[in-house]
Regions:
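Extended, charged amphipathic alpha-helical segments
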Residues: 200-334, 363-367, 375
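Extended, helix-rich architectural segments
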Residues: 1-140, 455
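Short secondary-structure junctions and interdomain/linker hinges
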Residues: 51, 110-114, 120-128, 237-262, ...
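Generic detection of long, well-ordered alpha-helical segments
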Residues: 100, 107-111, 119, 226-233, ...
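C-terminal anchoring/interaction modules
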Residues: 2-6, 263, 269-277, 282-287, ...
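Extended, regular secondary-structure scaffolds
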Residues: 119-124, 128-219
Length: 455
């Protein structure tokens, strides 16, 4: 394993002395490198589709943008969703080999949060995920933390603590939260602090002690970020703004020749006549270059970025029949391979996150969860013809891979247990009636019954 050094978000703490820890924490926050943070914040702006104008406006003069607004595109979230297929369908979480509905009910919005977390982890290269318990609503809640500072003890590779900003305020009064875990008999800490290193107790925790003993923060780290997608989005935004300016200028720039400088400002319009001196001319000059070529150049930016990330783009003006499911699978083979490479990262993270959830629920006396936990990530499916789908379902039923209950959920995943039981009862009743009718049709009929039936 190669070690190319720690990032600016990793800080070494010399020892467990409380005062040294406090000084190190405060100093680390002040030494945050602006460039790395700025790049990350730009990526977040483009992912959440906010504040994108400011990243494009800097490449244009103020006069240009008085004529048209900037033209940013939602490239980054679309690339992130297309690339991160692991949580496209919610995974199944097993506890001692069974699904625990009690846990699923208390883990509020876990599936949607993990999906967004996976996309940001891929985009940023590293992302953190915090679990907390909402006592008022009696549920676990999750928070994605893109900007987190990690703290390490000398000689260790596992983080001892974390801090993150909670209130930017102004530049002189920023607020942060610090968590650390129990280590060598020393209780972990939990408190709020400011830029000067002054600590503040969080309500209900005057001792500033971590009640869980472990950090309620987990993380996923990729070998590299995907900032090339962000840069491509900026480039596409610049190009699209240029195209918008070109469209605005298609009518052309009014040009006069053969007139004095003092006459350069002339009122014009369909209800105004322009009197030109002898030898003077007036015309509109349009910019050269076709819009089609400019649009094709934008497509090249997008296509190249997609290829670099094992993706492909099917443009709206593409011709031909829609590809079949098998053809789509072949076209997506590189992305499917990337999905397989994502599994180890998130299996390990799911285990760490579960241990945090388990501990928090125990501390709040909500429930005790087993140690055995397993995540089954859903397989990627592609559209099939009706005939193919029916044959597949029948094969699964015939071979015991799917039950009638599974079949009902396949067509209606939102059915609750009561609806399922009612529907299964109807199916069983109809089946019994069919069997009875077949039996009656096969039984011999006596001469008397024939006479009675005929009458």
């Amino acid at each position: 394993m190669y070690n190319f050094g720690k990032t600016v978000n990793q800080v070494v703490i010399p020892d467990l002395s409380e005062q040294i820890i406090l000084k190190t924490v405060a100093k680390a926050e002040l030494e945050f490198k602006e460039k790395e943070i700025a790049e990350k914040m730009t990526a977040l702006d483009f992912y959440y589709n906010i504040n994108m104008d400011k990243h494009i406006e800097q490449y244009f003069s103020s006069e240009s943008l008085q004529q048209i607004p900037t033209y940013p595109s939602k490239v980054v979230p679309r690339f992130a969703r297309a690339r991160m297929m692991l949580y496209k369908s919610p995974p199944k979480r097993y506890f001692n080999g069974e699904i625990n509905d009690d846990y699923n009910n208390v883990a509020y919005m876990l599936d949607s949060q993990t999906k967004q977390f996976s996309e940001l982890s891929w985009l940023l290269g590293c992302c953190h995920f915090k679990t907390k318990y909402n006592q008022m609503k009696e549920r676990l809640e999750y928070e994605i933390l893109p900007n987190v500072k990690e703290y390490y003890l000398e000689g260790e590779s596992h983080p001892y603590g974390y801090s993150y900003e909670i209130d930017k305020g102004n530049k002189k009064d920023r607020q942060y939260v610090f968590w650390s875990e129990d280590r060598d008999g020393t209780p972990g800490m939990h408190f709020r602090f400011d830029q000067k290193g002054k600590r503040y107790a969080i309500a209900g925790n005057e001792d500033m002690v971590n009640p869980f003993g472990l950090n309620p923060i987990s993380k996923v780290v990729y070998p590299s970020s995907s900032y090339d997608v962000v840069r491509s989005a900026i480039q596409i935004g610049i190009a699209m703004t240029e195209i918008a300016l070109s469209v605005r200028n298609r009518l052309g720039q009014p040009v006069f020749t053969g007139i004095d400088e003092g006459q350069s400002v002339i009122k014009s319009g369909i209800d105004s006549a322009i009197i030109l001196p002898e030898g003077g001319t007036f015309q509109y000059v349009s910019p050269t270059g076709g819009l089609d070529e400019m649009i094709e150049a934008v497509k090249i930016f997008a296509n190249q970025t997609a290829e670099n990330n094992h993706l492909r783009i099917r443009w709206g003006d593409s011709t031909g029949n829609a590809p079949s499911g098998e053809a789509l699978k072949i076209l997506e083979i590189e992305n499917l391979e990337s999905r397989e490479s994502d599994i180890p990262y998130f299996k390990e993270w799911e285990q760490t996150r579960y241990e945090i959830d388990k501990r928090i629920l125990e501390v709040y006396n909500v429930m005790t969860l087993p140690d055995d936990y397993y995540v089954d990530f859903g397989e990627i499916t592609y559209p099939m013809s009706v005939d193919q789908e029916l044959k597949m379902l029948q094969w699964k039923l015939d071979n015991g891979i799917m039950t009638k209950r599974d079949l009902l959920l396949y067509f209606n995943p939102d059915m609750n247990d009561q609806e399922l039981e009612e529907k299964l009862g109807e199916v069983a009743e109809e089946r019994n009636q069919e069997v009875q009718q077949q039996r009656e049709a096969q039984e011999p009929v006596s001469q008397i019954e024939r006479i009675l039936n005929a009458g």
